[in-house]
Design a protein with these regions (language model features):
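Membrane-proximal, glycine/serine-rich, low-complexity loop/turn segments characteristic
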Residues: 1-155, 170-205, 233, 237, ...
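Outer membrane beta-barrel strand-and-loop segments of large Gram-negative receptors
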Residues: 236-238, 278, 284, 373, ...
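C-terminal extracellular loops and terminal segments
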Residues: 17, 426-430, 447-513, 517, ...
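Outer-membrane beta-barrel translocator domains and adjoining extracellular loop/strand segments
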Residues: 31, 89-103, 149-164, 208-216, ...
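Outer-membrane beta-barrel transmembrane domain signature of Gram-negative proteins
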Residues: 213, 217-299, 311, 328-332, ...
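Surface-exposed extracellular loop regions of Gram-negative outer-membrane beta-barrel proteins
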Residues: 32, 37-51, 150-154, 253-260, ...
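Extracellular loop and loop/strand-boundary signature of outer-membrane beta-barrel proteins
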Residues: 51-53, 106-112, 163-171, 222-229, ...
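Outer-membrane beta-barrel transmembrane strand signature
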Residues: 437, 451-462, 582-585, 589
Length: 593
């Protein structure tokens, strides 16, 4: 269900809410959390609403609208969502430093740019439901997405001990249309069995353009020109069938899912023009048994995943088991203990596998790696939870290992004679640590609530050459929330830290946001301010030992003290059909690199 479908449910019609922070096998590799809302069935009903939040001084808009009508076994729905960003005051500072052919190079550039995007999603929905017998739903979505960047800058370019002043231009845009049809059918077979089917078809028509130019100011000599055009037509199909059999003391769930993405590329870049096709196929066969005895419950699952990626350069075929074990025990006084272990496979994303090449600076390009292999993840969690009038907290110990981890790094590039930022399957990657999350209510009510997330973590990466990199940090997010009658005041903040991201260290986005909401009947009025006293900040730098030493700091000054106003209206009356969609799939996202 979409956010708008959830909004359309009147609280008086909710029977119960089922929350799965460890989703069943059928959601494996697609969702970290699943929420199932069970509702009543009055006779006739309708719902409609709208939600709009906008900044007053810069381009920031989040909006949505929906309408639904239910009569008898039939449910009709219409939805629209828009997210718009248009920022014209971002300052980016970039440095590159490297040695090539016994010559030392350094580029220090400051760039000011204007960038943004517009995302729109229009959806039509029809459902036919006979409670306890069958569910049929058809959804047609059309996504319209566009983004742009216009930047100018200056750089001090140093060759050994000689400095020159350069001008730079960076322009890019990307847009795609994406119609998607999602068909779902579920039928109860007798009292103990249920069969579900899901079929999704989507099409992307994508156009991407990038132009980068750098030249020496003193004599207008070109340093480099990067002119890239990509047109891609992408077709995605996902099909899944699942069966559930209920035993007296347990439940057996089994299924098979297949997804295929085919992309036809028409590319012009700095190495010439080319037309090529790629195909990414993934299959997943699974079965899972779950049961509960007294205070002990368990889920035992086993499956197999096949990833078959084919490009002009190579064909990759990967088979891997996907076992999963969940053991839970209920302790006295609202306490519980749970252990989760699972092994999964993940295919490289399309841009990582791309054959495209774009110029970044003089002697440095960025490219994909068609020979990149699937990575395998082994995740382990031990979770302790407890709740009472004052506390609702979870403490987690985790240890995760990734084999053939996707990591970006710089390497010598024979094709261009310089360096290339590309992908490799690192030899090993692991992360271990602890996590404390939840809420504290000092007064035992919602007058004051502290929501917290604290996670001391250690990450370790081993490259294909055996070089070891390590990062230790404490990631955190906090929120202070006060609710009094129909007013809600909240303040969110964090302490940004550097975390390991491939062969780079990336800093968390800073947060200092304050919001005030007032609810009156079906209306909600809101106001607030993002990034109090500071612009949003982003910082990435390469690890020591990288062939190219890189750093990038950016600040978006448009959203410093960004004041927003919001208004929403949600009305719901009468019948709400109960649609428990047991299969939820998506095709691969657009390929834009």
């Amino acid at each position: 269900a979409s956010d708008n479908q959830v909004k359309s449910i009147a609280p008086t019609n909710v029977v119960r809410v089922e929350y799965f922070d460890i989703p069943p096998a059928r959601y494996s590799q697609r969702a970290d959390t699943v929420v199932n809302i069970i509702t009543k069935n009055p006779e006739v009903g309708y719902s409609y609403g709208t939600d709009l939040t906008s900044a007053l001084t810069t381009g920031f808009v989040n909006g949505s609208a929906y309408a639904g009508y239910t009569k008898g076994k039939n449910d009709f729905g219409l939805e629209y969502n828009i997210n718009l960003r248009d920022y014209d005051n971002r300052i980016v500072n970039k440095t590159y430093e490297y040695d090539l052919n016994q010559i030392h190079y350094r580029s220090a550039e400051q760039q000011k740019d204007h960038f943004g995007y517009t995302y729109q999603n229009i959806g039509l929905r029809y459902a036919n439901v006979d409670a306890g017998k069958y569910v049929f739903q058809a959804k047609l979505n059309m996504v319209l997405n566009s983004s742009f960047l216009k930047g100018i800058g200056q750089s001090i370019f140093t060759v050994d001990n000689t400095e020159n002043l350069h001008n730079t231009v960076h322009n890019s845009n990307s847009n795609y249309t994406n119609p998607t049809l999602d068909l779902y059918y579920s039928k109860n077979i007798g009292k103990m069995d249920e069969l579900s089917l899901n079929l999704i078809g989507s099409f992307y028509n994508t156009k991407s353009y990038q132009f980068d130019h750098e030249w020496r100011i003193s004599d207008n000599t070109d340093i480099f020109n990067n002119d890239m055009n990509l047109k891609a037509k992408q077709t995605g199909i996902v099909g899944e069938i699942a069966h559930v059999h209920n035993f007296e003391k347990g439940k057996l769930s089994s299924g098979y899912r297949i997804s295929n993405t085919s992309i036809d590329n028409d590319l012009i870049n700095l190495v010439g023009a080319s037309k090529y096709s790629v195909n990414y196929l993934e299959q997943y066969l699974y079965t899972e048994y779950s049961a509960k005895k007294n205070k002990f419950s368990y889920r035992l699952g086993i499956g197999i995943t096949n990833i078959h990626n084919k490009s002009a350069e190579t064909t990759q075929d990967d088979w891997a088991p996907t076992p999963k074990v969940v053991l839970s025990y209920e302790l006295p006084k609202n306490q519980s203990l749970r252990f989760v272990t699972q092994y999964t496979s993940q295919s490289p994303f399309a841009s990582a596998l791309s054959s495209n090449v774009v110029q970044v600076i003089h002697n440095v390009v960025q490219k994909g790696n068609p020979f990149l292999k699937a990575q395998h993840q082994f995740k382990n969690n031990l979770v302790y939870s407890f709740s009472n009038k004052y506390f609702d907290l979870s403490a987690t110990l985790f240890y995760n290992i990734v084999d053939k981890y996707f990591a970006q790094f710089y390497q010598l590039d024979a094709e261009t004679g310089g360096y290339a930022l590309t992908y490799e399957n690192a030899k090993n990657y692991n992360e271990k640590g602890a996590q404390i999350s939840g809420s504290v209510k000092p007064f035992g009510n919602n007058l004051l609530v502290l929501k917290t997330y604290i996670s001391p973590t250690s990450m370790r990466l081993v490259s294909t050459k055996g070089t070891k990199y390590k990062s230790n940090f404490i990631r955190s997010n906090f929120a202070l929330v006060s609710q009094y009658k129909d007013f809600t005041l909240s303040y969110r903040f964090n302490f940004p830290v550097f975390t390991l991201n491939g062969f780079f260290l990336s800093k968390d986005e800073n947060q200092h946001h304050i919001f005030l909401d007032y609810k009156y009947k079906y209306w909600t009025f809101s106001t607030g301010m993002y990034w109090l006293g500071t612009p949003s900040q982003y910082y990435t730098k390469s690890l020591p030992g990288s062939l190219v030493q890189f750093s990038r700091q950016s600040h978006i000054y448009n959203n410093k003290n960004m004041f927003v106003l919001g208004l929403s209206y949600d009305f719901s009356s009468g019948k709400k059909l109960q649609i428990q969609k047991k299969l939820n799939n998506n095709t691969a996202p657009a390929s834009t690199f």
